């Protein structure tokens, strides 16, 4: 009977387990045979042998149940291994990439926010004061013309630039101010390089007079352009904007031809990327600021994206052809 338990310990599956059970507990099994032998014994010898058989039978049944449980757990473990889904496998589903405009916006924000610039969000619908008058754009200025600006009946308009956000920020906050604004702007244009809706980014820094100089503006702009375009050359040109004085425009060496001359740069070797300058005192006076100085800059996000993604047609950004967008 000791042999039965030894055989039980070597069992590895249900089939072997059933064979051992029948051999031990079946009608013609070992224990049935032992009980049949009792009829040939008398008195105390019969009782002693019966107790011994009963003891071994209980021991076998206990060992059998433990082995049965162990085999069930083993088979379950093997089944789970076979049916397991390996979540570490690479997903074969094609994932999308970031839209060029979103990529460009995020890259701009990643540069300016660590420098302390706060991201401001303004309304798309503005009034005359915030979009024009406060920015030193008088009533006769061409930008107010119906051919360039979308007007509503209640004297409201779709903002033509993100500069109104600068005015709102200066009205609502006290200097020092460091802010950037990214958002949609609207003008009545539609061709290879213009769309009725486009995106701008503008920045503004304001502090007490004497604390902000043109050299601060120059340092910020040059750091940003080198961060965004890498090792390009920069060229500063004097310019005119009603809301800044002095004003400048900044060009970068052509990222397409490396200044050898191409159609994109009109064979000049330079590409215009932004405008900037010191905030005009007329702007400060319009909102009631006194004794302040500051600088502002602005650039088109589509323009930056076109240069980094080498896109020739601005309208590609707003088309729904995934074959085009997936190429960026």
From Swiss-Prot:
Binds 2 magnesium ions per tetramer. One of its GO terms (molecular function) is tRNA binding. The keyword Aminoacyl-tRNA synthetase applies. Coiled coil: none annotated. GO terms for biological process: phenylalanyl-tRNA aminoacylation. Its EC number is 6.1.1.20. Keywords: Aminoacyl-tRNA synthetase, ATP-binding, Cytoplasm, Ligase, Magnesium, Metal-binding, Nucleotide-binding, Protein biosynthesis. Its main location: cytoplasm. The keyword ATP-binding applies. Tetramer of two alpha and two beta subunits. This is Phenylalanine--tRNA ligase alpha subunit.
